Curated annotation (Swiss-Prot):
The keyword Translocase does not apply. Residues 772-830 are annotated as: Disordered. Residues 511-624 form the RdRp catalytic domain. GO terms for biological process: DNA-templated transcription; positive stranded viral RNA replication. This is RNA-directed RNA polymerase 2a. It holds the Pfam family RdRP_2. It comes from Cucumber mosaic virus (strain K). One of its GO terms (molecular function) is RNA-directed RNA polymerase activity. RNA-dependent RNA polymerase which replicates the viral genome composed of 3 RNA segments, RNA1, RNA2 and RNA3. Keywords: Nucleotide-binding, Nucleotidyltransferase, RNA-directed RNA polymerase, Transferase, Viral RNA replication. Belongs to the ssRNA positive-strand viruses RNA-directed RNA polymerase family. Coiled coil: none annotated. It is an enzyme of class 2 (transferase). Residues 779-790 have a biased composition (Basic and acidic residues).
Length: 858
């Protein structure tokens, strides 16, 4: 008994039940096809003519002669099949026919109307039936292609009376329909013939021209939208929805996303490994051997040298205003680290320091790119971006929500800083081309051995005020969330609620890595990068007026540092502190990467700002020189490449899951930071401890296999001993155990002052002779009666007596640490023979103690 062959479908194709393996079966299939075609020709009978009331003129569209026999070969360019044949067409062929007949309008990456295979084929069948039906109206019916479009868009089937068509419309009311021929057709069996390759004349999926693995991966690829569903919508209605600064597209709803529950599996056993006991001397020795130029680094007076030395700099179009500089406000001191890891002090934004930072971060823009057609090439780069990263169906079905909800969250976040709805400015009345400028007081730690010859330059921040940022940030936040939901599954942006560097079921071992280091990223961006961002934002669904408005005031801007009195014009380059900084840097990096490399060769791609990392089975192939010649970037392909991104190493455990580990070298440097403010109850130090514990929560997952991976990656990246990285993990395990262990890393000299001043009590009374006033006048020293400062102890003659009272609050709260220490030692030097108290006419005066007869009450 012969069993029918399996029907051709994607499911049968993927599970392996479809296909012809032997040449004999191929020949049998072809012979059956020839017999069926011959039988169809023998059984052909023309259908009887239909009697209609109106005659049909013969023209080029007629497909048959009056006797019903085919007269010539029919053109198959557009519409030459019946509805049944359209079912056998591929999706690409249906898209071509859809564009030809319906003529949809393209809006970014979306079509209006959207393509629906079932609706399109049904419209073709209905149009054929309408053209064959008898006429009941005197109006002229549309031609076949226009009729299909009218049925699909649910519009009128007839031409307007006042409008004449460009072509001569033909009133067709017979069975001779353009693109359709009445021929008997029936399938003899359920067998569907396989497709034949045109190149090698073999059954497809067996020929070398076909890549079955690529088809299987493309069909099985998922997006984040498949795992994250909309859980609920919460309405937000108040006065904030009346704001019109962002236009009418604000949607007053809040969309909450929750990851779909993962299947229940057995929990992996705990693989904690005990670490050796370490002390602070061992950690310092690790720093000395790993960072040889950092152990003796001390920048306490480096900025003093810069401010007091001669200064020469070359800048264009810089405006200096030294008349209204803002004085530095002294802080209350910082904790002193025990470890010396090369960490620097806080930088003060003086004029020279700001000019040095602007010279490095904003001025001297590189010009490495070639001359190109910006308009044409920017569109091509944007199209490549969507093809490489975006799932078009998810983008079309995704909602653009959460704008107003994000706006409320932003306002609540900065409510404590004085930001309110009433203080929001009118964006049309603001000059958005003016940006504020400042330098980062915290300098990023340096991992290279260059601290003995090079002084790190602080980074700069160019930003708008919160009132302006609060109106753009909600829009770009919602757009970024939609962008994440439409990404393909192999694309990862490790930021937000739905994405991280934790990758279940993916192993980084035995993979080729590709890491591109882009230096001078912010100031290297020009008009070409801005046009790419504009096309991508429009394609993602950002309102076109907002996109154009945003790009217009980024073409030419002016930055000004009010504290340093420095101003400078800039063009196109990235503003490091506005609402679009991270989003813009990420899409620029992704667009450049997609243009230089074929993204289909990578199993995983990770992007975050200007950082990128790719994993592939085979060595990646591409042209990294285009980063420089086309995109004006100083790019360097890291060799040897290791799984390293966002200052974190990626490791895989024994269960095939990947997790991130912060760079041990940078974490050791953070243990010696000099930026923790002093507080009496150690609240700032405890906040740093909790942040340290959160970053090192991976320690419980570090098995011996993971430690070996980290040691290998550490040695490949830094050319340093990998055994040092394992010792650093032991130190991290100790100092994350409890807060008391962490407190061993810092101390403050203010505690010594508190011990010295511990004998002070409520009031301090000192008696002196009245002749001191005459002696002061004689020496030319005059003091006011209401002067609250303490006069140093000296030798004075006897006479009238007075007393002074200095409260404990004044002595400890309003004086500096130095004056506290000096006052404590001088008070301790005064003899304490007795305790006396005297008043002079009920008044208290600030007078110095006398050398003879001075009595202090404690």
């Amino acid at each position: 008994m012969a069993f029918p062959a399996p029907a051709f479908s994607l499911a049968n194709l993927l599970n392996g039940s479809y296909g012809v393996d032997t040449p004999e079966e191929v020949e049998r299939v072809r012979s059956e096809q020839r017999e069926e075609a011959a039988a169809a020709c023998r059984n052909y009978r023309p259908l009887p003519a239909v009697d209609v009331s109106e005659s049909v003129p013969e023209d080029a569209h007629s497909l048959r002669t009056p006797d019903g026999a085919p007269s010539e070969e029919v053109s198959v360019e557009f519409v030459t099949y019946g509805a049944e044949d359209y079912l056998e067409k591929s999706d690409d062929e249906l898209l071509v026919a859809f564009e030809t007949m319906v003529k949809p309008m393209r809006i970014g990456q979306l079509w209006c109307p959207a393509f629906n295979k079932c609706s399109f084929i049904s419209s073709i069948a209905m149009a054929r039936a309408l053209l064959l039906a008898p006429r009941t109206s005197h109006r002229t019916m549309k031609c076949f292609e226009d009729l299909v479009a009218a049925i699909y868009t649910k519009s009128d089937f007839y031409y307007d009376d006042e409008c004449e068509a460009d072509d001569v419309q033909i009133d067709i009311s017979s069975r001779d329909v353009p693109g359709y021929s009445f021929e008997p057709w029936s399938r003899t069996s359920g067998f569907e013939p396989p497709p034949i390759c045109e190149a090698c004349d073999m059954i497809m999926y067996q020929c070398p021209c076909f890549d079955f693995n690529a088809l299987k991966k493309s069909c099985a690829e998922r997006t984040f939208a498949d795992d994250y569903v909309i859980e609920g919508l919460d309405g937000v209605v108040d006065n904030a929805t009346l704001l019109s600064n962002l236009g009418p597209f604000l949607v007053p709803v809040k969309c909450q996303y929750e990851k779909c529950p993962t299947p229940t599996v057995a929990n992996p056993p705990s693989l904690n490994r005990a670490t050796d006991r370490v002390d602070i001397n061992l950690v310092q020795s690790i720093c000395d051997s790993t960072l040889p130029t950092h152990s003796n680094y001390d920048d306490s007076f480096h900025q003093v040298f810069v401010e007091s030395a001669d200064y020469s700099i070359d800048l264009d179009h810089v405006r200096l205003r030294q008349s209204d500089l803002i004085a530095k406000i002294p802080d209350s001191g910082h904790m002193i680290p025990v470890l010396n890891t090369g960490s620097g002090h806080k930088r003060v934004g003086t004029t020279k320091e700001v000019l040095t930072a602007i010279k490095k971060r904003n001025a001297d823009v590189p010009e490495l790119g070639d001359s190109v057609n910006l308009s044409r090439l920017s569109k091509a780069v944007a199209e490549r971006f969507f093809i490489s990263y975006i799932n078009g169906n998810s983008l079309a079905s995704s909602n653009f929500v959460n704008v107003v909800s994000n706006f409320h969250d932003y306002m609540e976040k900065w409510k404590s800083s004085g930001l309110s709805y009433d203080d929001l400015p009118d964006l049309h009345a603001e000059n958005l081309q003016f940006y504020d400028h400042m330098i980062k007081s915290d300098v990023k730690p340096v991992v290279s051995d260059t601290l003995n010859i090079d002084r790190p330059v602080p980074a700069t921040i160019t930003y708008h005020k919160k009132g302006i940022t609060s109106q753009f940030s909600p829009l770009f936040t919602a757009l970024f969330e939609r962008f994440q939901r439409c990404l393909r599954e192999r694309i990862i942006l490790p930021v937000g609620k739905i994405s991280s560097l934790e990758m279940a079921g993916f192993d980084v071992k035995n993979k080729h890595c590709l890491e591109i280091d882009l230096s001078k990223f912010d100031k290297s961006q020009g008009e070409f990068h801005l046009m790419i961002q504009e096309h991508i934002l429009n394609g993602l669904g950002c309102p076109a007026p907002i996109t154009k408005w945003w790009c217009d005031f980024h073409r030419f801007s002016y930055i000004r540092d009010r504290r340093a009195g420095v101003g400078m014009p800039i063009s196109f380059q990235r503003r490091t502190g506005d609402a679009f900084t991270y989003f813009g840097n990420t899409i620029v990096t992704m667009a450049e990467f997609a243009w230089c490399y074929d993204t289909d060769q990578f199993e995983k791609l990770l992007f975050s700002g200007d950082d990128s990392l790719g994993f592939s089975v085979l060595p990646p192939v591409g042209d990294p020189s285009k980063f420089t010649t086309l995109f004006n970037m100083e790019a360097k392909v890291m060799e040897p490449a290791v799984p390293y991104i966002c200052s974190k190493f990626l490791l895989s455990d024994e269960f095939g899951n990947t997790f991130s580990v912060p760079d041990p070298l940078r974490e050791v440097q953070r243990l010696g930071t000099k930026k923790i403010p002093y507080s009496d109850n150690d609240e700032f130090l405890f906040a740093h401890f909790m942040s340290f514990v959160d970053r090192l929560k991976f320690l419980d997952r570090m098995t011996q296999s993971c430690i070996d991976q980290l040691s290998l990656f550490f040695e490949l990246k830094y050319r340093k001993s990998g055994a040092e990285a394992a010792l650093m993990l032991g130190a991290f395990k100790k100092y994350t155990a409890n807060f008391q262990s962490y407190k061993e890393l810092y101390y403050s000299d203010r505690r010594q002052c508190e011990l010295i001043n511990s004998f002070s009590c409520v009031e301090l009374r000192i008696e002196r002779s009245s002749s001191t006033k005459q002696r002061k006048k004689k020496d030319g020293i005059e003091r006011r009666r209401d002067d609250k400062r303490r006069t140093p102890t000296g030798s004075y003659g006897g006479g009238e007596e007075a007393e002074t009272k200095v409260s404990q609050a004044e002595s400890t709260g309003t004086r500096s640490q130095k004056s506290q220490r000096e006052g404590a030692f001088k008070s301790q030097a005064v003899p304490l023979p007795t305790i006396l108290s005297s008043r002079w006419f009920g008044t208290d005066r600030d007078v110095p103690p006398c050398e003879h007869g001075g009595i202090v009450r404690v």
